[in-house]
Amino acid sequence: MSNAREIRSKVQSVKNTQKITGAMELVAASKMRGAIVKMNNVRPYVESANTIIKNVTAASIDYPNPYLFDRDVKRVGYIVTSTDRGLCGGLNINLFKHVLKEIKNNIEDRVGVDVCVIGSKAENFFAKLKDVNIVATAHYNDKDKEGSIRAIGGAVKVMLDKFTAGEIDRLYMSSNQFVSTIKQRPRLQTLLPIQDIFSAEEIKANKEKATKGHWDYIYERDIEEVLNALCIRYIEAQVRGAILENAACEQAARMMAMKNATDNASDIIDQLKLDYNKVRQAMITQELAEICSGAAAV
């Protein structure tokens, strides 16, 4: 058993660490509130983009836009979002396990895989995989929002260009879904082709609404030009919404991780204090025994 001085040193060390984790918990909580506001602000835009693309594609199905229609799958692409920093529990590793399972299934089916990674954690993880080709990387920095959005937009455009050129036949988005402050879960959603995003029932219902005159669109320019631009905006909206939601997940996961670390530090301190009291009691008992032995000898 350690002596009393060593135990006191350990207690002080754990207390110092506890102060750091407690401060990080408060910082993460503050950042999480801001991230949730941004996430909620962008959701109406993403939902509107969903509705518009669903309605327009149902009414404009005659135009052979490469983003709309299914084709034989020989190669797929993934846009994987992660964090640039750690200390956020199992947020990143759970996401990587989820998407890696899908990637392995594709490789077993002899389907090639291209990956666009957002965040240094995903970049470091997928760089170690031999059968995965990283074609673009980007990072989201909350301090440089405009620069980050431009960088991410450029990385996403690489994947869109590859899809248009027929170099990939499916495009997926892998990110974390914000369920609550204490729960985040990995999510894999189809971005392209757009036809695969909606169920057969949704497509049929939208076609019926369009033919019955429930709604219609008047195009000021050529429908092909409008549809091309709309498809790109739709993908950008999905990616931006996923990135902001992933940022909220990161701060929530970090807050909970730091809270758990702070609570665990309290448990360790309690155990160390108990050990210290046992050592101190043993020392006192030994001293009393020595005094009694000396008195008896006299």
UniProtKB/Swiss-Prot annotation:
Membrane topology according to the record: Peripheral membrane protein
Main subcellular location: membrane
GO biological process, one term: proton motive force-driven plasma membrane ATP synthesis
GO cellular component: plasma membrane; proton-transporting ATP synthase complex
Keyword annotations: ATP synthesis, Cell inner membrane, Cell membrane, CF(1), Hydrogen ion transport, Ion transport, Membrane, Transport
Localization annotation: Cell inner membrane
GO terms of molecular function: ATP binding; proton-transporting ATP synthase activity, rotational mechanism
Pfam families: ATP-synt
Origin: domain of life: Bacteria
Biological role stated in the UniProt entry: Produces ATP from ADP in the presence of a proton gradient across the membrane. The gamma chain is believed to be important in regulating ATPase activity and the flow of protons through the CF(0) complex.
Similarity-based family: Belongs to the ATPase gamma chain family.
Oligomeric and partner information: F-type ATPases have 2 components, CF(1) - the catalytic core - and CF(0) - the membrane proton channel. CF(1) has five subunits: alpha(3), beta(3), gamma(1), delta(1), epsilon(1). CF(0) has three main subunits: a, b and c.
NCBIfam families linked to this entry: ATPsyn_F1gamma (TIGR01146), PRK13422.1 (NF009956)
Protein name (record): ATP synthase gamma chain
Organism: Francisella tularensis subsp. novicida (strain U112)
Name of the coding gene: atpG
